[in-house]
């Protein structure tokens, strides 16, 4: 094995990198640590300023905030070609964050790279594997017992390779990042689609797949297609029942689930100052639901206040010094502008089954009656990475306190998920948690829980039609409880609390009355609560594991008989030929999210074992041939069976296959398993009308061909019984379409064109069999 420095030098030479950037290089003008946990890793505002000035001089125009932060992290700002929506940028992120469900595969890939240490500050957060059953402490103990093997792997891998480890119970990754790691101007990538949460603190924080994280941890420049910038101008101010959540619910209704694809959403305008820092994080977090690359707010006094309250006054002071680089230039141009008057914005509730179906709360009851949606609310759930801040808990408690004063409790079941151990300890100290319990709530563990399907729900049977209301971010079919008949709606935590007390979608807290225990009618007043605790946060229990300075003796063991973890085998290289006679595994009808492609919930336990988790491949996708989920025709036997079984049959018999998809294929989570699984089971290409950004990149990273119909109507020319040949791979080049020959069973053929977004580097991934294979080639 070559020394680490030599490996890095070889990689950089092969990739054309001029200088190896490490975040710990000392600042010229100031030395402020990126976090309390990494005292020798410094914020590089001086480098950000230098790069911004180089790019501004080249482009000769005012820059948006998004451009400042992104271009400020260019690997080669003097020579990088920059064109929004077209060129690929080579960037140097400041840090990497991984949650436990995706960190398993990311760390397995990093181990395969052969590198001894991560090159940038990185952390692992245990939040996804804790199932909600009865309550916080018992659920946490159960999760530690069930997931001991995985937690031990992540802890020892973190110690071995220099990655900080947040133990189970510490909280949700995005809340931990906001409290400890995000700062104005940071470029952070995370292996979770809601990483944009950090935009609430003025950073560009982007969700990626594990293979992208491996690149950054290996010290390789990270590639991102130069994003467009959508400006959202906020005027007026929030008041009454209207909350930050309503801003993004409104934006989702305007832009839809794919309207932000390929763009950063940048909020600006005088209305920004009426929103708390954690409220801005809520808005940025749910920007993932419109397909945005990320979202961001400009640095302001709210962020300064939050930094100071979370023990980072030194960062706030440094940000003040560089403030001009942390806000947009006057006169900067956006690719699209949306204007929202916060004075006129009403409380919203979105759903069911998609986060962009927006309704004012005042109207949803009427719409539900018309559509036949269940009006009675079975469960109200507050928390999640989107809405679990101190302010969120305080506003919900303010609503609950009014109900208690009139002798009322929740008519619906009611659960509360604190965002972090710090939030849990602080709301316990300040009495909010007890108020929420008194109104009928159950406080769950500091984890994702029901939001990602980690919910052992007992009150209904699968297939039973029912309604739940959450303060979460996603409400895809079956996501929360694996029941396709659960009508899930997303709204603010205070609206969830009010609706859980009333027990019906027909209740409008702005106008409707409740009847107290004494028989008297009363109206809930709009909640008011502190955005931050008046005294310091209570940190609660210490849940962080520092990586040791010397890890030379650290072992990382993966049992060959484990059902949870599996070392990776390299994927096969491209054989240099066109892809002939591909069988169609499934032609997908309609929406196909990463939840449909690789379900979460009970499958999370297999996230570190590629072969086992591949048994959930596309089990949620609807087959256009019969309108059913997880039922496809085996082209050899002509029998219908589960998608994974059919894929395994094809792999065993040497039959290569393809998936045909609809619009925005792969929207939702960043989980790269949705790309690893089809590759592992013999897939070669995914052909759709359009892709979600993260999933398209993940497919490329694993050596698959994500292709789009040059004419979207060609989707209708392909039938599940056809065979496809993809031609032109010997001359595969950026911007050059590939040909697809459709071979029908009756002997006729049609030829169509397929577009792609591959650049030269990504084409090398395909030829090598995967991005990881290519990395290994460059080490030799």
Curated annotation (Swiss-Prot):
Modified residues (N6-acetyllysine): 50, 138, 144, 233, 517, 523, 573, 605, 723, 730, 736, 739, 743
Chain positions recorded as substrate binding sites: 99, 192-194, 474, 479, 607, 670-671
Keyword Transit peptide: yes
Residue numbers carrying Phosphoserine: 559, 670
Entry keywords, A to Z: 4Fe-4S, Acetylation, Iron, Iron-sulfur, Lyase, Metal-binding, Mitochondrion, Phosphoprotein, Transit peptide, Tricarboxylic acid cycle
Extent of the transit peptide: 1-27
Coiled-coil boundaries: none
Ligand binding ([4Fe-4S] cluster): 385, 448, 451
Subcellular location: Mitochondrion
Compositionally biased region (Basic and acidic residues): 524-537
Polar residues: compositionally biased ranges: 551-560
Free-text remark on how the cofactor is bound: Binds 1 [4Fe-4S] cluster per subunit. Binding of a [3Fe-4S] cluster leads to an inactive enzyme.
Residue ranges of the region described as Disordered: 524-560
Modified how: Forms covalent cross-links mediated by transglutaminase TGM2, between a glutamine and the epsilon-amino group of a lysine residue, forming homopolymers and heteropolymers.
The protein's role, per its UniProt record: Catalyzes the isomerization of citrate to isocitrate via cis-aconitate.
Name the UniProt record assigns to this protein: Aconitate hydratase, mitochondrial
The gene coding this protein: Aco2
């Amino acid at each position: 094995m070559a020394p680490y420095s030599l490996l890095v030098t070889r990689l950089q030479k092969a990739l054309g990198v001029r200088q190896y950037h490490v975040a710990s290089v000392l600042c010229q003008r100031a030395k402020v640590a990126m976090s309390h946990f990494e005292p020798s890793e410094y914020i590089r505002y001086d480098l950000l300023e230098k790069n911004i000035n180089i790019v501004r001089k080249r482009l000769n125009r005012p820059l948006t905030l998004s451009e400042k932060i992104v271009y400020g992290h260019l690997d080669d700002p003097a020579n990088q070609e920059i064109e929004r929506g077209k060129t690929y940028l080579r960037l140097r992120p400041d840090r990497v964050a991984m949650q436990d469900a995706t960190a398993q595969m990311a760390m397995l890939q990093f181990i395969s790279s052969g590198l001894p240490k991560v090159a940038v500050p990185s952390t692992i957060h245990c939040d996804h594997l804790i199932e909600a059953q009865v309550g916080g402490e018992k659920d946490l103990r159960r999760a530690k017992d069930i997931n001991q093997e995985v937690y031990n792997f992540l802890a020892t891998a973190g110690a071995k390779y220099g990655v900080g480890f947040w133990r189970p119970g510490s909280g949700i990754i995005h809340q931990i990042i906001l409290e400890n790691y995000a700062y104005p101007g940071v470029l952070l990538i995370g292996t979770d689609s809601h990483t944009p949460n950090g935009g609430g603190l003025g950073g560009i924080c982007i969700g990626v797949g594990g293979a992208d994280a491996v690149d950054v941890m290996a010290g390789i420049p990270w590639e991102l297609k130069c994003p467009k910038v959508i400006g959202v101008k906020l005027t007026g101010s929030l008041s009454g029942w209207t909350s930050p959540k309503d801003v993004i619910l409104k934006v989702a209704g305007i832009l839809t689930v794919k309207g932000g694809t390929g763009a950063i959403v940048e909020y600006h305008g005088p209305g920004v100052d009426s929103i708390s820092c954690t409220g801005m994080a809520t808005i940025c977090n749910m920007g993932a639901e419109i397909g945005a690359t990320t979202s961001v707010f400009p640095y302001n006094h709210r962020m300064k206040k939050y930094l100071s309250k979370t023990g980072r006054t030194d960062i706030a002071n440094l940000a003040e010094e560089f403030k001009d680089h942390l806000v947009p230039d006057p006169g900067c141009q956006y690719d699209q502008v949306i204007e929202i008057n916060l004075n006129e914005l009403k409380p919203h509730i979105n759903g069911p089954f998609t986060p962009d179906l927006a309704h004012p709360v005042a109207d949803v009851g009427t719409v539900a009656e018309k559509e036949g949606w269940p009006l009675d609310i079975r469960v109200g759930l507050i928390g999640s990475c989107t809405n679990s801040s101190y302010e969120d808990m305080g506003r919900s408690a303010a609503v609950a306190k009014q109900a208690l004063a009139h002798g009322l409790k929740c008519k619906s079941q009611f659960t509360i998920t604190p965002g972090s151990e710090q939030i849990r300890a602080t709301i316990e100290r300040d009495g909010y948690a007890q108020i929420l319990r008194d109104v009928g709530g159950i406080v769950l563990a500091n984890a994702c829980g029901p939001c990602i399907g980690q919910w052992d729900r007992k009150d209904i049977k699968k297939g039973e039609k029912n309604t739940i209301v959450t303060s979460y971010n996603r409400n895809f079919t079956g996501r929360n409880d694996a029941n396709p008949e659960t009508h899930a709606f997303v709204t603010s935590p205070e609206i969830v609390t009010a609706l859980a007390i009333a027990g019906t979608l027909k209740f409008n807290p702005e106008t409707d009355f409740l009847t107290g225990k004494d028989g008297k009618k009363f109206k809930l007043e709009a909640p008011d609560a502190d955005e931050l605790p008046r005294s310091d946060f209570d940190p609660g229990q210490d849940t962080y594991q520092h990586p040791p300075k010397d890890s030379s003796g650290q072992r990382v063991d993966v049992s060959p008989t484990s059902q949870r973890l599996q070392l990776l085998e390299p994927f096969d290289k491209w054989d240099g030929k066109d892809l002939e006679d591909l069988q169609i595994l499934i032609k997908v009808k309609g929406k196909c999210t990463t939840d449909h492609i690789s379900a979460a919930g009970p499958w999370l336990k297999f996230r570190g074992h590629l072969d086992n988790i591949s048994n959930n491949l596309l089990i949620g996708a609807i087959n256009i041939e019969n309108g059913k989920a997880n039922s496809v025709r085996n082209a050899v036997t002509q029998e219908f069976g589960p998608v994974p079984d059919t894929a395994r049959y094809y792999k065993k018999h040497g039959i290569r296959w393809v998936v045909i998809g609809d619009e925005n294929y792969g929207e939702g989570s960043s989980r790269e398993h949705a790309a690893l699984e089809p590759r592992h089971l013999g897939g070669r290409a995914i052909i759709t009308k359009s892709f979600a950004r993260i999933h398209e990149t993940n497919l490329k990273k694993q050596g698959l061909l994500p292709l789009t119909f040059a004419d979207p109507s060609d989707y209708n020319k392909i039938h599940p019984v056809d065979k496809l040949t993809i031609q032109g791979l010997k001359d595969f080049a950026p911007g050059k379409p590939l040909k697809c020959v459709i071979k029908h069973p009756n002997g006729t053929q049609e030829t169509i064109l397929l577009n792609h977004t591959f650049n030269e580097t990504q084409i090398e991934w395909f030829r090598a069999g995967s991005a990881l294979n290519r990395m290994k080639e460059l080490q030799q």
